[in-house]
Design a protein with these regions (language model features):
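Short, small/polar residue-rich loop motifs at catalytic or cofactor-binding pockets
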Residues: 142-145
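C-terminal accessory region of radical SAM enzymes
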Residues: 98-131, 162-210
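Basic/polar, acidic-poor N-terminal "presequence/leader" segments
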Residues: 53, 133-134
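Radical SAM/AdoMet-radical enzyme domain recognition
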Residues: 1-81
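Short acidic, glycine/proline-enriched helix-loop-strand junctions
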Residues: 14, 21-32, 44-51, 84-121
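Flexible glycine/acidic-rich beta-alpha junction loops that bind and position SAM and/or redox cofactors
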Residues: 13-18, 75-97, 119-133, 158, ...
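Radical SAM enzyme core and accessory elements
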Residues: 154, 159, 195-254
Length: 254
């Protein structure tokens, strides 16, 4: 497999808080050594990402990213949790200042480490200012329902993993004698590009964000063409930080 995603929520205390075992003990000490072994034995031409999650319980998530790097994981990603506000761990609009502060803090440390030759990759700070992806990827970055599908253990087909269980978006089953993905659904996803979304059309970040997550738009706004606001604001901050890192590398690098 060309790419694997290794899911570990963050530092030991962060991971064990969100991911206890069935006997209510922490899972970090079970999982982390296995991930390290996989990475150490993985061919250099194959990719991996260690993927964490930040919630209201670890808004200091820059520490989780640096923890991954210090543990030897050089390809990292830490994603914001997505959940309804009544969930105690869900992010809220009032958390944005702290989230922005953490991205800025991480960006400075990230750039400094790269300049010292001890760098690593953080998925959300990877940006190509010279060329970047093709125009199709720029206007609709999510391939759900067309380039990407999720298959459940029972064989049900959905546009992506976030739609699993939503019967309105069930596309079929791999055990069906003939599989024809419903055009009304696949076309809806295909047509949900940045020029079809009022909030995106005049946004400075649209060609780096590419319209955001379709599932979040539907789950929070019941409309695939109305982006998830918290996601938009965090993506703008990540782009700003990515540009700052590029500028710092150009000005201070060799």
């Amino acid at each position: 497999m060309h790419n694997v995603v290794l899911s570990l929520d963050g530092r030991k205390e962060v991971n064990d808080n969100m991911r206890p075992t069935v006997n209510n003990k922490g899972s970090y000490d079970i999982i982390a050594p296995k991930f390290k072994k996989l990475v150490s034995e993985r061919p250099k031409d194959k990719y991996y990402y260690i993927r964490g999650t930040f919630t209201r319980d670890n808004l200091d998530f820059s520490e989780d990213v640096l923890h991954f790097a210090n543990e030897g994981f050089k390809l990292t990603s830490v994603e914001p949790v997505v959940g309804e506000e009544e969930n105690p761990y869900a992010l809220r609009e009032e958390d944005l200042p702290k989230v922005f502060e953490e991205y800025e803090k991480l960006a400075v440390q990230y750039a400094d480490m790269k300049l010292k030759g001890d760098g690593f990759s953080f998925f959300h700070f990877m940006i190509d200012l010279n060329q970047g992806p093709c125009v199709i990827k720029r206007i609709t970055g999510c391939g759900a329902g067309n380039e990407y599908l999720a298959i459940t253990p029972s064989g049900d087909i959905y546009p992506c993993h976030q739609f699993v269980g939503n019967e309105d978006f069930k596309l079929g089953n791999i055990l069906d004698e003939k599989i024809e993905l419903p055009k009304e659904v696949t076309n809806m996803f295909r047509e949900a590009h940045v020029y079809a979304k009022d909030e995106c059309r005049n946004c400075w970040n649209k060609f780096y964000c590419s319209g955001g997550c379709h599932a979040n738009a539907i789950n929070f706004n019941n409309d695939i063409k109305v982006p998830y606001k918290l996601g938009c604001e965090m993506q703008k901050k990540r782009t700003e930080c990515s540009i700052m890192i590029q500028a710092k590398m150009m000005l201070e690098g060799n």
